[in-house]
Amino acid sequence: MLEQILATKREEVETLTLPAPLPERKRRPFAAALRRPRRMLGLIAEVKKASPSKGIIRPDFDPVAIAKAYERAGADAISVLTDERYFQGHRRYLRAVKEAVNVPVLRKDFIIDRRQVEESVRLGADAILLIGEALPPETLEELYHEAYSLGLECLVEVHAKETLERIFDRFTPEIVGINNRDLHTFVTTLEATKTLAPLIPPSCVIVSESGIGSFNDVKTVKSYGAQAMLVGESLMRQDDVERAVYRLFGEEDGDDSN
C-alpha cells in the first residue's frame, strides 16, 4: 500500500499548483509545545476522516469543529490529514484549522518533494510529517533542512530500526515519531516504541504514533520513553471528541487532576 500511495503522490506533485499564501502567517512553535505539555504526555490530536486500511472513520466530518474541540480539551497540537485519495483529507482543511485554533498545526501527508514543502508553508502549517520509510535518507535530510529554512518544523517518522539508523547516520532530527503501525502490513504494536525509544538521543522529542486508545496505552508509551503521542482514530471514532481526550488521560470531563 505504501508503494501505491507514493506512486500516486509522485503523479500529484507533477501537476501541483501552489496556493496563495495566507495574508499573515503566524508561526507557532511545534517542538516547544511538545516539550512543555499540558498533561503527563504531549498530545497531537489528529483530524482524520478515513484511512486505506479502515475506510471511513468519521462520517460526520467537520474538521474545524473537531479541531476546536481538541483545543478545548487541551491538545498541545493538531494534526490534519491532507491526502485526498487515500485518507479523504484536503489541503483546505489545513488552512481552515490553522485559522480556527491557536495551537500548532501539523500537516500529515506523504511529502516527497520540495514543492510540497513550499505548499505547506503557504497553507499555514507549523510543521510537516516526513516519513522515513517513504524517502531515501538523503532526500529526507534535504527536505528537512528545506523545511526549517522556510520556518517549518518536521516530525520525522520511523517504524524500523534500520530506518532510524540510516537517518541518524546523516543527521539528528529534533522531533522523532515512532510509528507503531507498519505502513507495509498495517500491523500495529506499541512494542515499536519500546524497541526504538532507547535508541534515540535525549535531545530529541520522541512521539509515539498509532495504536494508542486508552489511559493504559498512554502510561505504557510514557514508560517506554515517549514525551508525546499522536492519536487519531481512537478519538475520531467517538461521538464527543472533547470528552474522548479527557478519557484518554484517565480524567473525568474537564478534570485534569491526573
From Swiss-Prot:
The keyword Membrane does not apply. It is an enzyme of class 4 (lyase). It comes from the Bacteria. One of its GO terms (molecular function) is phosphoribosylanthranilate isomerase activity. It catalyses: 1-(2-carboxyphenylamino)-1-deoxy-D-ribulose 5-phosphate + H(+) = (1S,2R)-1-C-(indol-3-yl)glycerol 3-phosphate + CO2 + H2O. Pfam families: IGPS. GO terms for biological process: L-tryptophan biosynthetic process. The keyword Amino-acid biosynthesis applies. Keywords: Amino-acid biosynthesis, Aromatic amino acid biosynthesis, Decarboxylase, Lyase, Tryptophan biosynthesis. InterPro entries: Aldolase_TIM (IPR013785), Indole-3-glycerol_P_synth (IPR045186), Indole-3-glycerol_P_synth_dom (IPR013798), Indole-3-GlycerolPSynthase_CS (IPR001468), RibuloseP-bd_barrel (IPR011060). Its EC number is 4.1.1.48. Pathway: Amino-acid biosynthesis; L-tryptophan biosynthesis; L-tryptophan from chorismate: step 4/5. CDD domains: IGPS. Belongs to the TrpC family. This is Indole-3-glycerol phosphate synthase. It comes from Geobacillus kaustophilus (strain HTA426). The lineage of its organism: Bacteria, Bacillati, Bacillota, Bacilli, Bacillales. The gene is trpC.
